[in-house]
Amino acid sequence: MKYIFIICLSIFSSCVFSQPFPIPEDNEVSYDVIRKKKNIGSLISKFEDNEDSVVIHSVLKINVKVLFIPAYKFFQETKETWKNGEFVSIDGFTDFEDDREYKIIGNDEDNFFIASGMDGELKLDKNIVPLNYWNIEMLNEKEVFDTQKGIVR
């Protein structure tokens, strides 16, 4: 019985961990953004699973009001493309409430991940992982690609 359990666990683990992240059955995951026990925004990520790639479209909206008056706004929209479990491209836009706006673009090129953001063009390790809430793999990384500003953290 012990051996059957180990074999079943091995088969299940190889299926579950063959992707860098699990794709939800309904191809969507959403989070509420909570501050001081109040819902101030949302993050919605939609997964498009193609034959050889996964495209993740994420929208983050935050609106903070004080006495019904807007005090802070934030908006971010990104489209990430993953092929064979590897992060290969990003196209994003971030709008901070203080008029800062960033266009984030990145692609795998010549064994590097070439990206642009608030600091201009960056030549990063091809295996860089984006900073995203749904991807637990980022917790194992020493450096991640910040998709809000297009910088390395």
Where are the regions that the model predicts?
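Charge-rich, low-complexity amphipathic helices
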Residues: 1, 18, 78, 102-104, ...
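Sec-dependent N-terminal signal peptides
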Residues: 3-12
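N-terminal cleavable signal peptides for secretion/export
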Residues: 15-73, 90-100
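Solvent-exposed helix/loop surface patches that form functional interfaces
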Residues: 24-26, 91-153
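Hydrophobic/aromatic beta-strand elements that line small-molecule binding cavities or substrate pockets
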Residues: 43-48, 76-81, 104-106
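Juxtamembrane/interface motifs at transmembrane-helix termini
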Residues: 61-62, 76-77, 108-112
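A short glycine-rich beta-turn/N-cap micro-motif
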Residues: 86-87
